Amino acid sequence: MAQSPRNGYESNPDLIDWISAYQDNAYLNYLAGSLFAFGMERFKGAKIIEGLPHLEATFRHFKEGIIPLPTAGKAVAPFIWDWLIDEIRICLFFENFMKGELLFQGYVIHQFKDSTNDKSCRIGQLIKRQQKQPIPTSALLDQKVQTGELHRKTINMELMLRPSYQELIRLPNDVLLIVRRINENRNKLHFSSEAAGELGEALIRDLKLLDAFVDLQRTRLVTPNS
């Protein structure tokens, strides 16, 4: 179990000296666990995840002729209206999970900041390199990165879903395909008719698979006082 912050680190991410923090493996492990815990809470709080048994039963009863279409539609409607919000909650877990994996393995999750806009300079090269592959925390010292050269913003989900990052993160292929699709969908314009078209038995199966994956991560859950 990861331990809570020590050595005077602030709990507010904006106040943390990240150059120092990245050299403290115990603290990185704590942060990774905290990301897992926060993301898991959001995922489990998604309306559609909480309602998976109800939705599964509704589709089954409709197929078996136990309930008519209007009744099934009425049961599914609340999940359609909340689907975009639930997509965000689902993606938040996987974004946090992937950042936590990178931290746990000793890689930088923050973007680099170059005030010179010189792509050939030291930081410019790190920015370019980060778009192609994860940057190990050791590079911060090797490249003499200063606090002001590390952005408060972290890398985005699209980058972490790339093959070069997945070589380290290693989401299972079936999980990865579903997460990519949900992430792409949440970045589109949304209408209720589109959400209704997405919500079906195939999506329910996919969400059950994601839910099972999330449950497997409970061993990495951390609490602030642990």
Model regions and ranges:
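Charge-enriched, short contiguous segments at helix-coil
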Residues: 109, 163-226
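Short, contiguous, well-structured surface segments enriched in hydrophobic/aromatic residues
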Residues: 25, 29-61, 96-103, 124-150
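Charged alpha-helical initiation segments
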Residues: 1-85
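Short, hydrophobic, well-ordered secondary-structure elements
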Residues: 78-106
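Charge-rich, solvent-exposed alpha-helical interaction surfaces
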Residues: 18, 51-61, 122, 126-129, ...
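Generic structural signal for well-ordered, non-transmembrane alpha-helical segments
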Residues: 20, 24-27, 84, 88-92, ...
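Short, charged amphipathic alpha-helical segments flanked by flexible coils
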Residues: 102-171, 201
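Short, charge-rich amphipathic alpha-helical segments embedded
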Residues: 60-68, 103-107, 218-220
